[in-house]
A protein has these predicted regions:
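An alpha-beta-alpha
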Residues: 75, 142-208, 229, 322
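Periplasmic-binding protein-like
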Residues: 93-105, 123-127, 175-178, 226-236, ...
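Extracellular/periplasmic periplasmic-binding protein-like sensory domains
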Residues: 144, 243-316, 375-388
Length: 389
C-alpha cells in the first residue's frame, strides 16, 4: 500500500507539472511556505485566524531580512474545509516547490493528506490538530516522517484538566457527558476519566449524550451520585447549549471543557451569570502569559486592530518553528527542513515554550482558562506531565 501511494503521489505531481509548465527547481527570488487552510466553507473562522497569525509571522521575519538572505513568500491555497480539496492543495503546493506546508488545521482534512505528504517528502505542520493519529499511523504505530504539529495532543489536555480539577478545585467525584459521534470528544472523555480515576477519585457518571436536551434525564443522577464537577468535552456548538441547560436547571458545580470551547461564541452566546466556575484547556493564554506572547499579541493588534485568538497564535508558532528550522539547517529544501524540525527544542512561542518529541508532537504546558466578567482569563498553567501518546 505504501508503494502504491508513493506511485500515485508521483503521478499526481507529474501531471500537475506537465499541465502548469512550472519548474520544480527552488525559486531564486524567495523562500516559499505553503498554506493549506479553509479560507471559505467549513472551518473558515478558525483558518482565517490561523492565516492571520501566519501572515504576521511572515512579515516579522521579512522585516528582519527574510530567510537565507531571501524574502519569504506565502503560497496560500483554500481547501474550503473539504478533504478532497485539501488533497488537491497538496498537489498545487508540491508543484510550487514549497519548503514546508502549514495546515490543514481541520482534522478530517489533515488525515486525508498524510499519505501524499509522506510521498512527496514536504514537511507539514498542523497548527491546531490535537488527535493522536495525525503524527502516528494508528495501524502500524510508525511516526509519519514529514508530519508535525504546533498544538499539544488531546491526551495532554485531558490529563491536565483532570490534574487541575483534583489539585486546585479539590473535587472527588466527576461526571462526564460527551457527544458520541465525535472522535475528538470520545478521546478526551476517556483521557480525562483515566487520569481522574488513576488518583483514586471516581467517575460514577460517564454517559454519551447526542441531543443536549437529553441532559435533563440525568439531573437527578448527578444529585444521587453526589457529583462535584462535570466534564463536557466537545466543540462549542454542542457545549454552549449544554452549559446553558445545566446552569438554567440549577447545576452549580464547576463545568470543565477542552480547547474546543475557545473563541468568541462562549462570551457572546452564554449568559455571563452562567460562566462562573467554568474552566477549559487552551493553547494561548493571552498577552500576559509570557514576553513572547506579549510581543505576538501587540504586533497582531497593531496589524489587525484586534486581539488574537488561539488559532492565530498557533498559526504564528507553526510558521516561526518552520522559519527557525530553515535558519538552523541553512537550507530551504523540504527534506532538510523536515530533518531540522525534528530537532526543535525550547522554541519560545506565543503559545508557550515548545519542543517536539519522538512522535513530532508538541511538548508544552497546558493553560487552564476561566472567565472573569465574561472574558477569558488565565486560571492556571499545568506543566507538561512527561507522558506522550
Amino acid at each position: 500500500m505504501k508503494r502504491y501511494m508513493e506511485i500515485l503521489a508521483f503521478c499526481m505531481l507529474f501531471m500537475a507539472f506537465f499541465l502548469s509548465g512550472c519548474s520544480l527547481s527552488p525559486t531564486n527570488t524567495g523562500v516559499l511556505i505553503g498554506t493549506n487552510l479553509a479560507l471559505s466553507g467549513k472551518g473558515m473562522s478558525y483558518s482565517t485566524s490561523t492565516e492571520r497569525g501566519i501572515e504576521l509571522a511572515k512579515d516579522m521575519v521579512n522585516d528582519r531580512g527574510g530567510l537565507l538572505g531571501r524574502p519569504v513568500q506565502i503560497v496560500s491555497v483554500d481547501n474550503h474545509g473539504k478533504p478532497e480539496d485539501a488533497e488537491a492543495a497538496i498537489q498545487q503546493l508540491t508543484v510550487r516547490h514549497v519548503s514546508a506546508i502549514i495546515g490543514p488545521d481541520l482534522t478530517d482534512c489533515t488525515r486525508v493528506v498524510l499519505p501524499n505528504v509522506e510521498a512527496v517528502k514536504i514537511p507539514l505542520i498542523s497548527p491546531a490538530c490535537t488527535q493522536p493519529d495525525i503524527t502516528v499511523d494508528p495501524k502500524s504505530h510508525e511516526v509519519y516522517r514529514y508530519i508535525f504539529r504546533a498544538a499539544y495532543i488531546d491526551a495532554s489536555q485531558g490529563r491536565a484538566m483532570a490534574d487541575y480539577a483534583l489539585k486546585q478545585l479539590h473535587v472527588k467525584r466527576a461526571a462526564v457527558f460527551y457527544y458520541p459521534d465525535k472522535t475528538y470528544a470520545q478521546g478526551l472523555a476517556e483521557y480525562f476519566r483515566s487520569a481522574f480515576a488513576a488518583s483514586g477519585s471516581e467517575v460514577p457518571v460517564y454517559i454519551p449524550v447526542e441531543e443536549v436536551q437529553d441532559l435533563t434525564k440525568y439531573l437527578s443522577l448527578l444529585q444521587r451520585e453526589n457529583v462535584d464537577v462535570i466534564y463536557l468535552p466537545g466543540y462549542d456548538d454542542w457545549t454552549i447549549p449544554a452549559i446553558t441547560l445545566l446552569r438554567s436547571h440549577g447545576i452549580s458545580q464547576p463545568l470543565l471543557g477542552p480547547d474546543g470551547w475557545n473563541g468568541p461564541k462562549m462570551e457572546r452566546d452564554v449568559d455571563i451569570s452562567y460562566l462562573t466556575q467554568v474552566y477549559y484547556t487552551d493553547h494561548y493564554a493571552g498577552h500576559d502569559a509570557s514576553e513572547a506572547a506579549r510581543r505576538f499579541s501587540q504586533a497582531y493588534y497593531e496589524k489587525y486592530g484586534e486581539w488574537p485568538d488561539s488559532y492565530a497564535a498557533l498559526g504564528y508558532d507553526a510558521f516561526m518553528m518552520t522559519a527557525e528550522a530553515i535558519e538552523r539547517c541553512q537550507s530551504a529544501e523540504a527534506p532538510d527542513v523536515a530533518r531540522e524540525l525534528e530537532k526543535t527544542i525550547d522554541y519560545d512561542g506565543a503559545t508557550g515554550t515548545i519542543s517536539l518529541d519522538a512522535n513530532h508532537d508538541a511538548i508544552k504546558d497546558v493553560f487552564i482558562m476561566t472567565f472573569k466578567d465574561g472574558q477569558p482569563e488565565l486560571a492556571a498553567t499545568i506543566p507538561f506531565d512527561g507522558q506522550t501518546q
